[in-house]
Amino acid sequence: MNAERLMQVILAPVVTEKATFVAEKNQQIAFRVVADATKPEIKAAVELLFKVQVESVQVLNRKGKVKRFGRFVGRRRSERKAYVALKEGQEIDFAEVK
């Protein structure tokens, strides 16, 4: 896989109450990823960027909600999330990552 493509796959970590709960309970980390990212690409990107070993990747597509803006109807953007499980003894410290 192209290293340049792998650098663009992961957009941001998801920092929500639910993501924190999942991280503590299942030792998984949630990331927002590009819409056309595949599981092998996500795994390779996490291993390249954070220097950790990935055990598994679970992916979900969240549809954007329909919202009203005054008299106009709009739509929030859809997003793709990846829950990445790290191998035993591995962890990512976001404070150290540059």
From Swiss-Prot:
Record GO biological process: translation
SUPFAM superfamilies (UniProt xref): Ribosomal proteins S24e, L23 and L15e (SSF54189)
Mitochondrion found in the keyword field: no
Transmembrane segments: none
Organism domain of life: Bacteria
A GO MF term: structural constituent of ribosome
Record's signal peptide: none
Keywords for this protein: Ribonucleoprotein, Ribosomal protein, RNA-binding, rRNA-binding
GO cellular component terms, semicolon-separated: ribonucleoprotein complex; ribosome
Self-association state and partner proteins as the record states: Part of the 50S ribosomal subunit. Contacts protein L29, and trigger factor when it is bound to the ribosome.
Function: One of the early assembly proteins it binds 23S rRNA. One of the proteins that surrounds the polypeptide exit tunnel on the outside of the ribosome. Forms the main docking site for trigger factor binding to the ribosome.
Name of the protein described by the UniProt record: Large ribosomal subunit protein uL23
Species, as recorded: Bordetella petrii (strain ATCC BAA-461 / DSM 12804 / CCUG 43448)
Gene giving rise to this polypeptide: rplW
